[in-house]
Amino acid sequence: MSAPLASTPAFNAAELARVVAAAPHRLLFFGGATAVLLSMSWWALVLIGQRSGAAAMPLPLLPAGWAHAIGMQYQALPMFMFGFLLTVFPRWMGLKAYTRWHYLPVGGSLLLGYLLFHGGLLGV
């Protein structure tokens, strides 16, 4: 006989936030992954709107290709780079590891800037 399946615990946002904020690479990689997924969703909606002829998305002030290039190059990619660098620089330079108060403002500001950028593209 097999043992009964253990019940899946309920989603706990506080626990997720604690785990994500436990190290610089987790926070910034999470922000970068979120940025990439949001960009893919936005880009898919833009392309579907252009292909179908329906006005599914408000037209951004920038051409969609330029907005994609700016968002990926200057906002999504730096989150991955900073996540890596904030994790390895202390070890490479013989410094003590950063505390949460060093990298939480960095990750939060980068993600907030990215969300505001996409909010502007959506006309919010």
Question: What does each model-identified segment do?
Answer:
Residues 1-124:
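Hydrophobic alpha-helical transmembrane segments of multi-pass integral membrane proteins
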